[in-house]
Structures are given as structure tokens and as C-alpha cells.
């Protein structure tokens, strides 16, 4: 269910703003989006897994908060990020 270290490194490389950037909102949102996609696939076969569903809602809320922050600070970066990730908004 969790993302592999290689996939996480690839996401960091793709969305980083600088060479060693791992904490920018873009990177965090990309990693959260990957985790959300994995959990969504999990629920296709495990529909009654309510403990994990609570974790999914927490991840979605965290991603929403980061996106709101990014929209407040720099709307251009926000727009390009949601287009790259294919997030509805």
C-alpha cells in the first residue's frame, strides 16, 4: 500500500524546486496524491476497511490544507501543480 522509496525519490526529483528540496508544498502534495491514489485502489477490493478510510480522509485533508496554503502564497505555482497532478479543482 505504501509507496516505494524509489517512487518517492522520483516524485521528489520531478516536483522539487531546487536540488535538495524535499519539503516544498509541491513535493508534499505530489507524495500525498500518490498515497491517496494507492489507498483508493485498496478500497476497490476492501470496501469495509473503515480504519484505512479514516486515514485516507486525513491524507485528503492534509493535501487540501497544503493546496490552500500554496494558492494563498503563489497562485501560479498552485495552478501548474494541479494541472500536472490532474487534481480536480
UniProtKB/Swiss-Prot annotation:
InterPro entries: Ribosomal_uS15, Ribosomal_uS15_bac-type, uS15_NS1_RNA-bd_sf. It comes from the Bacteria. The keyword Ribonucleoprotein applies. GO terms for molecular function: rRNA binding; structural constituent of ribosome. One of its GO terms (cellular component) is cytosolic small ribosomal subunit. GO terms for biological process: translation. NCBIfam families: S15_bact (TIGR00952). Belongs to the universal ribosomal protein uS15 family. This is Small ribosomal subunit protein uS15. The gene is rpsO.
